[in-house]
From Swiss-Prot:
Keyword Chaperone: no
Protein known as: Transcription elongation factor SPT4
Localization per record: Nucleus; Chromosome, Centromere
Zinc finger (C4-type): 13-33
Native organism: Cryptococcus neoformans var. neoformans serotype D (strain JEC21 / ATCC MYA-565) (Filobasidiella neoformans)
PANTHER family, per database record: SUPPRESSOR OF TY 4 (PTHR12882), TRANSCRIPTION ELONGATION FACTOR SPT4 (PTHR12882:SF1)
Keyword annotations of the record: Centromere, Chromosome, Metal-binding, mRNA processing, Nucleus, Transcription, Zinc, Zinc-finger
Main function: The SPT4-SPT5 complex mediates both activation and inhibition of transcription elongation, and plays a role in pre-mRNA processing. This complex seems to be important for the stability of the RNA polymerase II elongation machinery on the chromatin template but not for the inherent ability of this machinery to translocate down the gene.
Subunit description: Component of the SPT4-SPT5 complex. Interacts with RNA polymerase II.
Amino acid sequence: MPPKSGRAELRACLVCSILQSTNDFLTQGCPNCEDILEMRGSAERVAECTSLLYDGMIAMIEPSESWVARWQRIDKRMRGIYAVRVTGRAPQDVIDAIEARGGVYRPRDAVED
């Protein structure tokens, strides 16, 4: 859950767009993407795989039942607070890992290459 002190401390995951504090990413990793991102314990990796620049917030309580979750492609993700749009791209090694597992990396900034 987001810290009580507000938005200024939140970072967004560049893969799934979940919002957490820097400390939460550092101590717990990403609840959706940790097996690929491996942020837990690495401040450098948290900085590479998350962004302070994002627009909008979505409180997702029942992702599997939400049209907003389907629209944002987070309907199979954990409950939490998500950004609508995140500025930045995941590192190439992350994109390669997603593709090696048969997935497709979809940037969260809504900008087409």
